Amino acid sequence: MSKSKDKWGFSTRSIHIGNSPDKEEGSVSQPIHLTSTFKQDGVGKNRGHDYSRVSNPTRARLEENLATLDNAKHAICYSTGMAATTALFQLFDAGDHILISRNTYGGTYRMSMNVLKRQGLTFDWIDTTDPENVAKYIRPNTKLVHVETPTNPLLELCDLEKTAAVCKAAGVLLSVDNTFMSPYGQRPLDLGGDVVMQSSTKSLSGHSDVLGGVLTTNSDDLDERLRFLLKATGGVPSPFDNWILLRSTKTLELRYQKSSDNAVELANWLDGLGLSRVIFPGLDGHPQHEVAKKQQRTPDGSVIYGNMISIDVGSNEARDRFLEKLSVFTLAESLGGVESLCCVPFDMTHAAVPVERKLKMGITESLIRLSIGIEDVADLKADLQNALSK
């Protein structure tokens, strides 16, 4: 007797859940439902969908797929990762308070401080590496603790089980931006999180060819409220983008494991070169190395450290020389693709964050974030070695 679908392994689910052969024509690849509206059999009598802003068959298949990868009951897909984060924060009212990891993605800072703050939400940006520190900042009007783990770009980790216990005791929701780890490397709902956010533009897609975002949860109430907001605000992905993502998750395990293996080899090599800083959770000297070993696990239980490395080359001159000499790595924003990318967070991904704040956190002008791809690791090492040579 074959296993039931909920007992399938990660890759089997990523390939088959939401991807069963089309019932009408038998096509193995899911069709794309490129339609804005649907025929109704009578007034208010539809066949499951009425308008693609509300729902679309291709999006429904993708949501089924992404939910199973996160071990979630529900998944809600958005046009971008920022659309997903904005929807999450829009669950709350003027006067409510949200705590956020201190070196979160710059787009989250821009949206929170320049948009939602004007609408009455209040924010504090705190060190979430220590659960006791999180507890100190929770107020009576705190509604949400939103953490990145690892953070972007300094790769600080939050102990999710301990932080979830703090939030539960205070009656506060815990949301986790899991973009850097993907469901293959970390499943925050299993560790006590209430909502998981991911930019599906990144490792879920893995080919730098689509924008998307997703929220997953086991809460029926949160799912209902988030779907109402999505219907009201309209930040939905197109059917084609949904289909591209549904295709891409089939290879998530292969891509993420290979890129992470490459990152481990490169980080250990870089750590011996005498750079100002090499930041990677897999290094013994990383402050939260033990947390990484505890919670960053593949579905079979193996420890995994992710595919992101940050290095500080010490000066703007060294940075510019490094970037100019690269030939395999591409200078570009984003991450998680099959191709290796690099960026300077100070001027790129975190440009919206005030200079004083960046420097206080350790985001210097000479800090370079590396997104490790699936190329031959020898070629990546040679490219970095050449770029670092004087």
How should these model regions be labeled?
Residues 37-86, 90-91, 107-114:
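Conserved N-terminal alpha-helix of the aminotransferase class I/II PLP-enzyme fold
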Residues 3-11, 17-19, 235, 284, ...:
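Positively charged, small/polar-rich N-terminal and surface patches that mediate targeting and assembly
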Residues 1-56, 62-65, 368:
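N-terminal "arm"/small-domain region of PLP-dependent enzymes with the aminotransferase-like
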Residues 264-336, 353-359:
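Conserved small-domain helix->loop->beta segment predominantly found in fold-type I
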Residues 210-212, 304-308, 365-369:
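Short, solvent-exposed beta-strand edge segments and adjacent coil->beta transition regions
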Residues 245-254, 306-314, 369-373:
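Short, well-ordered beta-strand elements within core beta-sheets of diverse protein domains
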